[in-house]
């Protein structure tokens, strides 16, 4: 997802982004979370082609292959788990560095994924998706998870804060939420420096 609708488009996209200095990409086996996933052999071909491209450029691009088996609308939880494991191992064999399975939050399920997939496992830390809350970082570490992604969580939290500030300003004419967020002052100063640095970057 995000790189093109066919192999040629995907390779063309990756060719363009490697020179920017990136160290890795995320590639998904669904399109717009369609309940019908991309055929696993076709997806493996995409991974292998990306790996061959990065190798030909003398650069090891980290490929984080995401399977959306748990998003599919059909099948039991066990069937989705089995498909995630099967796809994860296939993607690893095709050249992926790590496997991203989401949304999962049950400790037993996560432990099974770590045990059965022969690759570092990536979990989404985002309680806004699904019915459960992802275990803490220390708990995920104990389960053997190698990488935690915040996904769109940071942006959603930022937009929610902006909405709260705007509502207070509109309804009460006060700035308490904004001022509380910018306290202590050193944090506010650091945030300003980060913002101006991003603005001035090429």
Regions found by a protein language model. Name each.
Residues 151-202:
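Extended, intrinsically disordered, low-complexity segments
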């Amino acid at each position: 997802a995000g790189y093109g609708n066919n192999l040629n488009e995907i390779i063309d996209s990756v060719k363009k982004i490697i020179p920017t200095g990136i160290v890795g990409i995320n590639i998904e086996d669904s399109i717009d979370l369609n309940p019908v996933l991309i055929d696993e052999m076709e997806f493996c071909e995409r991974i292998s082609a990306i790996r061959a491209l990065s190798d030909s450029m003398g650069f090891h691009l980290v490929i984080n292959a995401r399977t959306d088996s748990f998003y599919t609308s059909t099948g039991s939880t066990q069937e989705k788990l089995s498909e995630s494991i099967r796809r994860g191992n296939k993607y690893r064999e095709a050249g992926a560095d790590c496997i991203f399975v989401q949304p999962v939050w049950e400790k037993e399920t996560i432990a099974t994924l770590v045990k059965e997939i022969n690759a570092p496992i990536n979990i989404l830390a985002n309680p806004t998706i699904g019915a459960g809350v992802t275990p803490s970082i220390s708990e995920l570490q104990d389960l053997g998870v190698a990488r935690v992604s915040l996904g769109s969580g940071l942006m959603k939290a930022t937009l929610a804060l902006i909405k709260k500030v705007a509502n207070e300003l509109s309804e009460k004419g006060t700035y308490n939420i904004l001022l509380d967020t910018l306290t202590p002052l050193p944090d506010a100063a650091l945030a300003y420096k980060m913002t101006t640095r991003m603005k001035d970057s090429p």
